Amino acid sequence: MHNYLDFEKPISDLEGKIIELKKLADEDESIDTSEEINRLESRVNDAMQDIYSKLNAWQKTQVARHPQRPHFVDYAKSLFTDFTPLAGDRKFSEDAAIQAGLARFNGQPVAIIGQEKGNDTKSRLKHNFGSARPEGYRKAIRVLELADRFSLPVVTLIDTAGAYPGVGAEERGQAEAIARSTEMCLNVKVPIVSVVIGEGGSGGAIAIATGNRVYMLEHSVYSVISPEGAASILWRDSTRAKEAATNMKITSEDLKSLGVIDGIIPEPIGGAHRAPETVISATGDVIAKALADLSQRSGTQLRAERRQKFLDIGRNL
């Protein structure tokens, strides 16, 4: 069953009528509803084109958070082979919010790291809704160290509202773990390609997104804080999240114009959740092209370019 967002009500109404007509035809084969169904499907396409061509920042945030949007595990299954996940930080415990390990991409050995939100109640609790604790970032550091040691390109997939802000996480050094992970991303002498596939929230995102190439899916968002959090801080009113989202410049178009990201991966009309295979394939093509380009550079050059890239962002914004 499709989960509709608030602004998708016209689409919901039309698709509801299509379902009713198909059910009616199934119950009585003498009734021909094909012409009406075709007409309604055409109206659905027109409605989606109209709605998705003018999404505002808050609506894009809702699309980025859609529960049926493809997650890290979907990309891992479709784009990579021989994925061998690594677990634990060798200091405290395992954190399933971050998935990381070794795999092959188009036959090439790589390291992959990403946040996983889960797709049902059980898996969301297991993965802590994609909000990593220090152990997750220290696991990412382990994989980055392995990649550097064995000269493996790194692919990171970002999808988190932010790092977990719990007391235990803070007591175990959340800030230090995020800083160390960011530092490791900046220091390794291998290519890093990062893609924001959903939400890119705060330091929890940047900790694994400090890549030589950074891309965003068309309807993903990337920001220092959630719109609700920004509204609560600025105006003491979380209901002004829509206003905050607009002012924060969190969309892929905003960030491309600001020079924060290198490119935008188009999504089908209706969002990635409507055609996940199409989006995953397009993402794979972008990653492949970026890795092919970056493979021509030396390790020293890769590290220097990556550092300069993020220094320039800090100086120019």
UniProtKB/Swiss-Prot annotation:
Subcellular location: Cytoplasm
SUPFAM superfamilies in the cross-refs: ClpP/crotonase
A GO MF label: carboxyl- or carbamoyltransferase activity
Keyword Lipid biosynthesis: yes
Keyword ATP-binding assigned: yes
Swiss-Prot/TrEMBL keywords: ATP-binding, Cytoplasm, Fatty acid biosynthesis, Fatty acid metabolism, Lipid biosynthesis, Lipid metabolism, Nucleotide-binding, Transferase
Cellular component GO terms, alphabetical: acetyl-CoA carboxylase complex
CoA carboxyltransferase C-terminal domain: residues covered: 39-293
EC number from the UniProt entry: 2.1.3.15
Superkingdom of the organism of origin: Bacteria
Reactions catalysed according to its record: N(6)-carboxybiotinyl-L-lysyl-[protein] + acetyl-CoA = N(6)-biotinyl-L-lysyl-[protein] + malonyl-CoA
Pathway assignment: Lipid metabolism; malonyl-CoA biosynthesis; malonyl-CoA from acetyl-CoA: step 1/1
Described purpose of this protein according to its UniProt entry: Component of the acetyl coenzyme A carboxylase (ACC) complex. First, biotin carboxylase catalyzes the carboxylation of biotin on its carrier protein (BCCP) and then the CO(2) group is transferred by the carboxyltransferase to acetyl-CoA to form malonyl-CoA.
Name of the protein in question: Acetyl-coenzyme A carboxylase carboxyl transferase subunit alpha
